């Protein structure tokens, strides 16, 4: 990597935490089962199309942020090596991001907004790990074609070049989206390269648009390119076994579908059900040589730390250990947080810390990349990212199985025991 000797100031440190009240229609994603909670600092834009599931949002003040657009970093350049205020114990995290993530902006009120990256970056900087800030590189055309079709890529590029437009009622392309999507798709690859080069022990990709809903030839759920899948496919091509843990509140239908028949990628998902996008049933276990490598643990709305810890202790961690991945990718969505307006779940920051700690122990705190997915309350995103990095780097207490198991987890254990040694 080249050192960027005059690092640009990526983000203002100040954040406005004023709160606006929001109402969600019961038909949001057709499955919202919990009332919306307060959402921190959302910009006021034009109204969304009348068919959008987002049409009921009423947003307040924006979070001020700025990025040095006039001084764009070279791909893969280190912006700064910022040791924490605390003893980081030698644990280094590559924080991979790019200014283009702030340029992907919706033409209507939208929860998937640039300030999410601001919050994630600030959360990473507040962690006790040593942060190595790295500029994402673009994913190459061949890296994208390992996941998406040529026609689909052409369509995204053409639509962006023409100024953008809606792909569906919730997913959009702007004039800057194609560039942002290429850098977002390359962020996980950049983190892998930083770890390979010895610059970091693990990585966190704070980029957008998110990716886990994107299919081979279809954008959906705010996602354009499947960032985690692009990274996984590149690792598989070099002979690695890859595991993907997806703790976003929504099932990662795109990631599961892209590797549904592959024995080289293990996909494990905890998610709200029934909920958007309607996939992720326990019985979706993969097919062909990949039978058993799709592991779904749907949980009812309102589930919190107890249910997630049960899922990790009884399903995620045992299967991860038996699979023995060379690399772990985490679709790190934070819309499962109790304060998130979309996820309908009840996690708090310490739950993300516990889950990340268990993964850190499982992976010996290396060869792991977290990639930002959902999460629409800025304060919750910031606090949860801090907790995630601290948990992975320093967490020492393994997740313990609750005395009484969650019945939804019981069902997952019963099904997945056909392929894995679970009790």
Label each residue range with its predicted role.
Residues 87, 92-95, 155-423:
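A general "terminal functional-core" signal
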């Amino acid at each position: 990597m080249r050192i960027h000797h005059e690092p640009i100031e990526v983000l203002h440190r100040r954040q406005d935490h004023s709160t606006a009240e929001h109402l969600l229609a019961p038909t949001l994603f057709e499955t919202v089962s919990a009332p919306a909670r307060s959402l921190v600092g959302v910009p006021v834009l034009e109204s969304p199309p009348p068919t959008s599931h987002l049409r009921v949002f009423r947003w307040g003040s924006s979070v001020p942020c700025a990025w040095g657009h006039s001084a764009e970093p070279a791909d893969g350049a280190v912006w700064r090596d910022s040791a924490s205020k605390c003893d980081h114990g030698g644990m280094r995290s590559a924080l991979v991001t790019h200014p283009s993530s702030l340029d992907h902006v919706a033409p209507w009120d939208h929860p998937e907004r640039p300030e999410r990256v601001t919050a994630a970056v600030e959360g990473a900087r507040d962690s006790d790990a040593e942060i190595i800030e790295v500029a994402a590189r673009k994913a190459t055309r061949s890296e994208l074609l390992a996941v998406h079709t040529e026609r689909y890529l052409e369509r995204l590029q053409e639509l962006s070049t023409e100024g953008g437009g809606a792909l569906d009622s919730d997913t959009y392309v702007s004039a800057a989206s194609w560039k942002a999507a290429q850098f977002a798709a390359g962020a996980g690859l950049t983190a892998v390269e930083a770890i390979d080069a010895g610059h970091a022990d693990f990585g966190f990709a704070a980029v957008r648009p998110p990716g886990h809903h994107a299919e081979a030839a279809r954008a959906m759920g705010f996602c354009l390119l499947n960032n985690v899948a692009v990274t996984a496919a590149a690792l598989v091509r070099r002979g690695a076994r890859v595991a993907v843990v997806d703790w976003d509140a929504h099932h990662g239908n795109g990631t599961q579908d892209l590797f549904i028949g592959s024995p080289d990628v293990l996909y494990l998902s905890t998610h709200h059900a029934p909920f958007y996008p309607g996939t992720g049933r326990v019985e979706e276990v993969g097919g062909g040589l990949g039978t058993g490598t799709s592991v779904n643990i749907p949980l009812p709305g309102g589930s919190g730390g107890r249910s997630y810890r049960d899922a990790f202790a009884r399903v995620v961690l045992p299967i991860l250990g038996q699979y023995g991945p060379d690399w772990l990718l985490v679709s790190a969505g934070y819309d499962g947080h109790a304060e998130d307006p979309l996820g309908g779940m009840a996690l708090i920051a310490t739950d993300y810390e516990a889950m990340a700690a268990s993964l850190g122990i499982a992976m010996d705190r290396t060869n792991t990349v977290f990639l930002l997915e959902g999460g629409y309350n800025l304060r919750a995103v910031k606090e949860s990212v801090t907790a995630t990095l601290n948990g992975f780097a320093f967490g020492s207490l393994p997740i313990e199985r609750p005395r009484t198991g969650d019945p939804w987890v019981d069902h997952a254990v019963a099904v997945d025991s056909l392929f894995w040694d679970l009790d």
